[in-house]
Amino acid sequence: MPTAGLVIVAIGGIWLCVLRNRIRLCALPVITAGFMTILLVKAPDIIINRDGGLVAINLGGGRVVMSPGNGNGFERDMWQRRLAVESPDPWPSGGIDRVSRIGCDPSGCITEIAGKTVAIVSDPVSAIEDCRRADYIILLTRIPRRLCDDERVVLSTFHIWRDGAHAIRFGPEGPTVETSRERRGDRPWSRVSDKRRQYIE
């Protein structure tokens, strides 16, 4: 829920509890309006878990594809509820899936979101090629920083290591990224950025 929605719900709740006459019932529409702000939040286009081992791509219309694997069952269920899907579509095993608009091979996947080409790369060799042709890159592997334009790299293994799970939304002005670290805030035990790192990791 957006911060504004939480504030509206809180105000409505206080109104409902403090007042004792019939006017207190006017707080109910206020609380409802606060909860309705959830509908204003665009669902993430791509979600990546805290170790990069689980990826979900939101196709819209209640359809989502998730990377294969038997682990991360709790996260899978949580993501399905968050994206309001009963069951994800199968992850393309090879070639281009015309229905999902996603092309995958063992080195990663490429898709189009908001009119831009997005590559999710798990192989260093493929990363070099995708860094030349894709508009945005999500690196699930390490490569030398000089081989990929920083402006194209939305997410790297270093970001995942430092910030945990990521939710990415693509729009006309480019991608916006929400991380689990932002939600929990900085803690004494949180990992911190090391600008001296030689690799995108």
List the predicted regions and their residue ranges.
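Transmembrane helix-bundle segments that form internal channels/tunnels in multi-pass membrane proteins
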Residues: M1-G60
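Acidic/histidine-rich
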Residues: I31, K42, V55, R63, ...
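Membrane-interface segments at or immediately adjacent to transmembrane helices
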Residues: L39-C109
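Solvent-exposed soluble domains appended to multi-pass membrane proteins
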Residues: R101, D105, C109-K116, V121-E201
